[in-house]
Design a protein with these regions (language model features):
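ER/secretory pathway lumenal C-terminal domains and tails of membrane proteins involved
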Residues: 1-5, 22-224
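Phosphate- and divalent-cation-binding pockets in alpha/beta enzyme and binding domains
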Residues: 17-21
């Protein structure tokens, strides 16, 4: 049910291995790139994701190898130094920098990378998301100016950092989906912008307040 050339985030083996089998053995939907979040903390796996595979382009990741190799940015602390939202792209550039002012000295063991705000956003080019089919014309009035999330907890893993970077770097070029049935923490606040398409949630620039029922996220594309 994924749109062509999509990126699909999965988590566990049960989510991922059947999809790998379908692509590798059956040759089915090789244009879709499967990104397993439980592996995305490994530098070797990030290397693979950045390369073209089958019929899918490499995953858009702005970090270079020296910025994500093993032992570097394995976790990033969240420090609420400013309240106003910052663009996710700007924050990723901040985290990737080695300038002294981008490091925190609040912890024992030396300077660590940090994110200076909980409030992040991805700007939305309304014309672009209509032209490339992210949003259907009949929903054009629902498009938000920016997709906003608020980070939870005190830190991010490398895998979570890569998810944010992929969404920021992609900039609405390729369809991005999260698998259904993942823990809500894995959605990182994007569930308010989910659109159910078959058995996957597509990230769209339309905000839908979640219902009280657990795992009841976003809106539904009934045309799939």
């Amino acid at each position: 049910s994924c749109a062509p050339n999509a990126i699909l985030f999965t988590y566990g083996d049960n989510d991922t291995f059947p999809l790998w089998y379908a692509q590798e053995v059956e040759g089915f939907r090789r244009d879709v790139r499967i990104v397993n979040l439980s592996l995305l903390a490994g530098d070797w796996y990030i290397d693979q994701m950045k390369r073209k595979a089958y019929e899918s382009d490499g995953v858009p990741i702005s970090f270079t190898k020296d910025q994500y190799h093993a032992g570097v940015r394995d976790f990033v602390t969240i420090e609420e130094r400013v309240q106003q939202p910052f663009s996710m792209k700007e924050v990723m550039e901040f985290v990737a920098s080695d300038r002294p002012e981008t490091k925190s000295n609040r912890y024992q063991g030396g300077a660590v990378d940090f994110i200076p705000t909980r409030n992040l956003y991805i700007p939305v080019d309304k014309e672009k998301v209509l032209v490339n089919g992210t949003v259907q014309p009949e929903d054009s009035a629902l498009i938000v100016d920016r997709v906003e999330i608020q980070l939870k907890g005190n830190s991010l893993t490398k895998s979570q950092l890569m998810v944010l970077d992929i969404l920021a770097t992609n900039n609405w070029e390729r369809p991005i989906y999260f698998g259904v049935g993942m823990g809500q923490d894995s959605y990182m606040g994007f569930d308010k912008y989910f659109q159910l398409e078959g058995a996957a949630y597509r990230v769209v620039p339309i905000k839908t307040e979640n219902n009280a029922a657990y795992y009841d996220f976003g809106r539904i594309n009934t045309e799939i």
